[in-house]
Amino acid sequence: MRGWLRHATVAFIALISLIPAASAENAKAHRSARLHRMVIQVDQNDSTVMNLALNNATNVIEYYRAKGQDVNVDVVAYGPGLNMLRADTSPVQDRIKNLKNYAFPSRIQFSACNVTKAGMEKKEGHPIDVLSEVVMVPSGVVRLMELQEKGWSYVRP
């Protein structure tokens, strides 16, 4: 019985000694699979700028897809750029719908500034609808700041 206990103890100690090595390998693999994140600013009511922003997003998604990696993209629209995400004025709404579906397994979000939306509603005198793919954020500029503070790469087409 003592022999069995001694062998079990030695096996247990040997097993425990492998844990730090496995943890180090996992940490190394995790670091090499870095999460890619990009935020794109759209603040102009210009279809050329809007299309360029969508081209940038598509190109980045395709680049990392070819490498077998995912990327998170957030297109933040505020000021006159909010027209990109309005249901009644967006010249790129079909591209937005298609890109939202195309991006998977990467992730793309379209963020609309609520400060801008409220200002437009007040000026126009009626509620404004945004595209169904849009997430409302309290402030577009604050969203840009917070994502950059978290390490997101910033692009302004």
Which role fits each region the language model picked out?
Residues 2, 20-21:
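A subset of signal/propeptide-processing and intrinsically disordered low-complexity segments
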Residues 1-9:
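Bacterial N-terminal signal peptides that target proteins for export
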